[in-house]
Amino acid sequence: MTTSFLHVDFQQPAEMRFNRARVRRAFVTIGQRHMRDARRLVMRRARSAPGENPGYQTGRLARSIGYMVPRASKHRPGFMARIAPNQRNGEGNRRITGDFYPAFLFYGVRRGAKRRRSHHRGASGGSGWRLAPRNNFMVETLEKNSSWTRYFLARELRKSLKPERRHR
């Protein structure tokens, strides 16, 4: 599966000044807000049903959600925010050791991985799921905050581009 991305290169006019630090701060703010909202979705202290957001028992999933704004290098400006459970080099997260738990929540687990006499799906009754798939809370967070993110980023880009002062 390939990921699509958009890259725009432009020459900066000599009479304009671009404040990169302000835009990077905007990405940090975006990452913090998305992390906060994703954590709130998995903080409900109730047993979750199939299709709902995961319930909160130990809090490990909620604490593992973090964000990362990569450092700028000579090849990349660092204008990006990654928000995910178990985010490597993430800010404000504690990693989950062992198997990747959010994948079990998203895909679910079928009952009876070992084949026995009655190995057919739901042969003993029930749905055939040991853990039915839950809602993808990260996608829900991104969709909920997409208009705010677009507005906030456009505002910060507008504020970061200033005309250069002319010396008389």
Task: Identify what each model region corresponds to.
Residues 1-94, 100-168:
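Short, Lys/Arg-rich flexible segments
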